[in-house]
């Protein structure tokens, strides 16, 4: 079959990798002519002598404010707090310090400014349309996990009224600069680091096994799988190994590239999104549990592609799903829904909700009946 399609590169984003934060951040501040800056972070990273303090010392005279307490799943209320701070006169840049929840909140806060969103309910307007104006001020991301949210042009924000996580898009929503300093991740709790590493693998695997992958998404996802399969287990046994942590960061960067050009993920992401909304389960944990089961379900439709990934991960003829399940176990992460707080009586509702998810509908093998979905989730229970 002759390949056919079109390619538009992702956003014009500067990614600085392998350089210490104390070296990279001042150069960014200088190059962007930043006179006033703000830090946005979560409670743990804002602790005394934590990473936010180190960033504060680096920003020095430009720092005007630090917004703390951004919560998991990026609630609308937190988005509005950040937006209010960004409205301050003369703010040129915001530095997000933390994982996906922090950077998602800041990404959304920036489009609140360009769309004159003044309260949480007003965010509903952005579900259908946003101004073409590029988000401002500049956003510099210092990620501490492997979620990949710092590379995408969309933000998932939780509506506290419904518990639903809405997605907001803008072509320029991704941060202007991402600084991948492995030392900045040393304080990340082990379970969070490793589970977001599995999430990154899920990004890469489902991109590679998508219905309509592209040459770009194939190249980046295959690179990601090789990197993460090699380096992530090393960070379990040698958590201070900066080379291994940087290898994971680069793997996470490559893993999400398919999503940045519109290659849809599949049922692992779709079911995971529902699990997160209905049970509060972290996205990384949903990937640990669901990805092997989805791969087994998809095997008739993606056998050859799964075999290539298994080989790239260094398996000796072992099925990809089994290899990943073993990896989850070796990393000490949950592999069953019941071990992550899901009750058996929730399965039917989860199955029904998952059938409506766009990622499930994009799955490489049809998964469109309640019976099939329930069987799949039961297998993971």
Regions found by a protein language model. Name each.
Residues 201-205, 248-256, 291, 324, ...:
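Short alpha-helical scaffolding segments that buttress acidic/His motifs in well-ordered protein cores
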Residues 1-93, 337, 371:
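ATP/NTP phosphate-donor binding region
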Residues 310, 314-381:
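C-terminal charged capping/lid subdomain of soluble metabolic enzymes
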């Amino acid at each position: 079959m002759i390949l056919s399609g079109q390619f538009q590169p992702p956003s014009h984003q500067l990614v600085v990798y392998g350089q210490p934060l104390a070296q990279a951040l001042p150069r960014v501040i200088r190059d962007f002519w930043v006179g006033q800056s703000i830090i946005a972070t979560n409670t743990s990273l804002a602790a005394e002598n934590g990473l936010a303090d180190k960033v504060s010392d680096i920003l020095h005279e430009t720092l005007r404010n630090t917004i703390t307490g951004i919560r998991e799943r990026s609630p609308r209320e937190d988005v509005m707090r950040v937006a209010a701070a960004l409205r301050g006169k003369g703010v040129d840049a915001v530095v997000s310090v933390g994982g996906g929840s922090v950077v998602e909140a800041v990404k959304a806060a920036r489009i609140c400014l360009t769309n004159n969103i003044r309260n949480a309910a007003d965010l509903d307007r952005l579900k259908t349309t946003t101004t073409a104006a590029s988000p401002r001020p500049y956003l510099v991301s210092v990620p501490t996990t492997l979620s990949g949210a710092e590379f995408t042009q969309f933000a998932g924000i939780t509506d506290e009224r419904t518990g639903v996580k809405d997605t907001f898009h803008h072509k320029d929503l991704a941060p202007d600069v991402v600084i991948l300093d492995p030392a900045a991740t040393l304080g990340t709790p082990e379970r969070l680091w490793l589970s977001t590493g599995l999430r990154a693998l899920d990004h890469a695997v489902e991109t590679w096994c998508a219905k309509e992958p592209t040459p770009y998404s194939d190249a980046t996802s295959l690179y990601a799988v090789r990197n993460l399969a090699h380096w992530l287990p090393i960070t379990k046994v040698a958590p201070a190994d900066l080379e291994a942590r940087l290898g994971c960061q680069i793997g996470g960067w490559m893993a999400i590239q398919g999503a940045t050009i519109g290659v849809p993920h599949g049922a692992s992401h779709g079911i995971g999104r529902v699990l997160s909304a209905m049970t509060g389960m972290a996205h990384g944990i949903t990937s640990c549990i669901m990805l092997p089961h989805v791969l087994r379900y998809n095997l008739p439709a993606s056998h050859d592609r799964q075999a290539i990934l298994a080989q790239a991960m260094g398996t000796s003829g072992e099925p990809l799903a089994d290899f990943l399940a073993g990896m989850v176990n070796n990393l000490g992460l949950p592999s069953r829904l019941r071990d992550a707080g899901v009750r058996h009586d929730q399965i039917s509702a989860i199955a029904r909700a998952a059938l409506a998810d766009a990622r499930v509908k994009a799955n490489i093998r049809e998964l469109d009946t309640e019976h099939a979905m329930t069987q799949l989730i039961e297998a993971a229970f």
